[in-house]
Amino acid sequence: MSLTTVILAAGKGTRMRSALPKVLHKVAGKTMVQHVIDNAKALGATTTNLVYGHGGELLQQQLANNNVNWVLQAEQLGTGHAVAQANSHVNDDDTVLILYGDVPLTKQSTLERLLAATPKHGLAVLTVNLANPNGYGRMLRVDGKLVGIVEQKDASPEQLLISEVNTGIMAVNGRLLKSWLGNLSNNNAQGEYYLTDIVAMAHSEGVEITSAQPDHPMEVEGANNRIQLAGLERAYQAWQAQELMLNGATLADPARIDVRGTVTTGEDVLIDINVIFEGKVTIGHNVEIGPNCVLKNCSIGDNVIIKANTLIEDATVAAKCTLGPYARLRPGAIMEEDSHVGNFVEMKKTRLGKGSKANHLSYLGDAEIGEKVNIGAGTITCNYDGVNKAKTIIGNNAFIGSNSSLVAPVNIGAMATIGAGSVITNTVADEQLAIARGKQRNLDGWKRPVKK
């Protein structure tokens, strides 16, 4: 028995007021439907079927890296009709998990609980109890057992009082699902083929029906407009903030961070306001992150201080380093232990050695910088000739004077000193002093120009 998922993503989403298909709107930096696809993968689904309609070409472009079966629903005739389009991809002995492309926050643990409750030859429904169930299909029970689902528009006044509602997410045996889908009717207030009708069919055939519930109602909320989308974003970010705090991070304001990927932190981490985490971020112990920083796909060692407005992307920062304010580490930047990068310093594809410092106004690209090197303010590695990139190598304990230009490819030896304002184009040997600038001239009697 294998797991097959069917993800419904055919809706146009007119209330979004957007040319973008609804399921391509993002929560936490990732499209809603990608959240759902990732969940299916994490559950070990052997087949993922994505039922699409509106904006199919754009969907396929943006989700091209996913291994899914693309299933067209040419006419939107209801959820039952949508699932039926995937029948040819469903085996009789499969467990079929039905998910929704605009319901991105369902936790893997919740779906695992639903699957664990699914009878081998039966049906399990994910339900939730709501204080205000308006708009949802109500779960019908007799002596505690599920017997059916009634949609809001078809419900009686008594049934509208029921607080347990259908989330739409269910798991069912493949053979039974295909049988029931073939017998659906559209004789209802909506004139649609309701997937929910299979619950009553199961009951009438004596098939076992079970249910499970999520840990939080927001797990099963969808987004039909941008207000609801913002609500999903805030719920997700609140959960991420709680997880960070439980793992040893102090947040200056839990409502003012954004996690758009995964963050792993050590103990005693301090995170100030408006910090954004993207991709995979790993943070060690005793790290301080100032306000308005962006960390993307990076590793931060223990006892690091990251000052305000610093950007770190695809970079590695070892223990005891200090960055910022207004520093930028671009892809391939590596700071070794106890190195410093200060305000308005940018690094790309550069290794800054242990104990080295670039504290002010520098660009360091395609460089290997040794230990205990001082990079003076305004220093630039001139690594690009308009076509190719070249490398700058600086030995241990070198001193680079302020406002120097190091024209790559160039090698600066250990203990070498570069005079301020120099343009270095040739190798400087170990312990040499290099000065490459115009000779100063002082002119007596010079008169400033005057306005005519």
Swiss-Prot record:
GO process annotations (BP): cell morphogenesis; cell wall organization; lipid A biosynthetic process; peptidoglycan biosynthetic process; regulation of cell shape; UDP-N-acetylglucosamine biosynthetic process
Region listing for Linker, in residue ranges: 227-247
Requisite cofactors: Mg(2+)
Subcellular localization: Cytoplasm
Ranges for region N-acetyltransferase: 248-452
Classification of source organism: Bacteria, Pseudomonadati, Pseudomonadota, Gammaproteobacteria, Alteromonadales
Active-site residues from the entry: 360
Region (Pyrophosphorylase): 1-226
A molecular function (GO) term: UDP-N-acetylglucosamine diphosphorylase activity
Name of the protein in question: Bifunctional protein GlmU
CDD domains in UniProt: GT2_GlmU_N_bac (cd02540), LbH_GlmU_C (cd03353)
One protein family per Pfam: Hexapep
Positions that bind Mg(2+): 102, 224
Family according to the record: In the N-terminal section; belongs to the N-acetylglucosamine-1-phosphate uridyltransferase family.
Keyword presence, Transferase: yes
Cofactor: how bound: Binds 1 Mg(2+) ion per subunit.
Known partners and oligomeric status: Homotrimer.
Gene this chain is encoded by: glmU
